[in-house]
């Protein structure tokens, strides 16, 4: 194994991005930046043309389905962290809407690390601080360095995988 291969790291898991659909462009831009820095990301599905043409009843079904799909991604075993893209919206600084707050709560309940792109909004300050949410104040490098420090070396993964494949036998004492 070369020294370069030894230094390579595999991210501990996916970073699930969430936020208001009005920030969809920002969500995708940040996902690309994280991917370029070696962190795999998961983004919400975009609202499609079907949403624009849907009846009110169909729209509720589409929203429910999209929410359920993204919530499953938040709680997935391969997810390491949740990043809320809480950009200013409608004059509200550090906006976190109800779906984003639900995704953060689910992430907390499943032991995921929580990050906020901007600061912690006052209305959720107590909960988010209690949950250990990290405010990035727009500095993605905080998330990148934290997540890469938690990354594992490929040889550690292969040792773990090899170990899982070993059949475990009860210990038999050696006769004297």
Model-derived features: positions:
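Conserved catalytic or regulatory cores that recognize and/or transform ribose-phosphate-containing ligands
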Residues: 1-176
């Amino acid at each position: 194994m070369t020294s370069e291969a030894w230094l390579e790291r595999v991210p501990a898991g996916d970073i699930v991005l969430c936020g208001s659909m009005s920030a969809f462009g920002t969500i995708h831009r940040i996902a690309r930046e994280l991917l370029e820095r070696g962190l795999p990301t998961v983004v919400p599905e975009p609202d499609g043309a079907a949403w624009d043409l849907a009846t009110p009843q169909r729209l509720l079904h589409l929203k429910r389905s999209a929410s359920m799909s993204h919530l499953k991604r938040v709680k997935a075993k391969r997810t390491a962290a949740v990043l809320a893209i809480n950009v200013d919206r409608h004059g509200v600084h550090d906006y976190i809407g109800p779906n984003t707050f639900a995704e953060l709560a689910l992430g907390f309940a499943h032991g995921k690390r929580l990050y906020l792109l901007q600061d912690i909004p006052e209305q959720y300050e107590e909960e988010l601080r209690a949950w250990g949410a990290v405010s990035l104040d727009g500095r993605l490098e905080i998330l990148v360095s934290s997540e890469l420090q938690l990354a594992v070396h490929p040889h550690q993964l292969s040792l773990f995988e090899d170990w899982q494949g070993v059949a475990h036998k009860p210990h038999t004492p050696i006769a004297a």
